């Protein structure tokens, strides 16, 4: 499974570079946004000179707070886009696993299940062509999946497609990705 570890490390390294690029961009946008908001604040103060000093200060604080909220939202959106990009890259890499890593994945999936010897393994077209009609003592199904594998035992299908696994674990993966990239 070391190739999967290398794959994860490479993806995280690329994601970190992308995160840094996005953060620099967002910081520049935030600075410009804050400068524009400060100009708006100054105009508002000049327009309401007849109001008391407390009202002007209160308005300034609300505008700054609003700018900070918008800034925070921009950063959150950039992080969300980064996570989506990392997950998309991960899915593409998983779809292109070499046959040894793919077999390791299928074997691990089989180890976690209590299935009968009559179960069938549903593979990707590419791996079905490479691996043949039987693996690990189980028949390879005529059906195919887009990525990963499914295991059919009677009327029960165990979904181990990579896209489904990533979606199922998305919240945990998001936390882990953001933790690895941003500390």
Swiss-Prot record:
Domain of life: Bacteria
Keyword Ion transport: yes
Alphabetically ordered keywords of this record: ATP synthesis, Hydrogen ion transport, Ion transport, Transport
Cellular component, GO annotation: proton-transporting two-sector ATPase complex, catalytic domain
GO MF annotations, alphabetized: ATP binding; proton-transporting ATP synthase activity, rotational mechanism; proton-transporting ATPase activity, rotational mechanism
Biological process according to GO: proton motive force-driven plasma membrane ATP synthesis
N-terminal signal peptide: none
Similarity field: Belongs to the V-ATPase E subunit family.
Function: Produces ATP from ADP in the presence of a proton gradient across the membrane.
This protein's name: V-type ATP synthase subunit E
Species annotation: Fusobacterium nucleatum subsp. nucleatum (strain ATCC 25586 / DSM 15643 / BCRC 10681 / CIP 101130 / JCM 8532 / KCTC 2640 / LMG 13131 / VPI 4355)
Gene that this polypeptide is encoded by: atpE
């Amino acid at each position: 499974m070391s190739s999967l570890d290398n794959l994860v490390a490479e993806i995280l390294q690329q994601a970190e570079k992308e995160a840094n690029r996005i953060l620099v961009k967002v910081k520049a946008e935030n600075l410009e946004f804050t400068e524009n908001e400060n100009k708006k604040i100054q105009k508002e103060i000049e327009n309401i000179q007849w109001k008391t000093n407390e009202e002007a200060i209160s308005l300034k604080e609300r505008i700054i707070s609003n700018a900070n909220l918008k800034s925070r939202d921009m950063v959150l959106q950039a992080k969300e886009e980064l996570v989506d990009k990392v997950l998309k890259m991960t899915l593409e890499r998983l779809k292109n696993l070499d046959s040894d890593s793919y077999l390791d994945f299928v074997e691990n999936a089989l180890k976690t299940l209590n299935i009968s010897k009559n179960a069938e393994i549903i593979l990707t077209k590419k791996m079905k062509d490479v691996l043949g009609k039987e693996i690990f003592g189980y028949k390879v199904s005529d059906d195919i999946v887009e990525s990963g594998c499914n295991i059919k035992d009677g009327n029960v299908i165990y979904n181990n497609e990579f896209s489904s696994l990533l979606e199922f674990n998305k919240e945990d993966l998001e936390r882990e990705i953001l933790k690895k990239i941003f500390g």
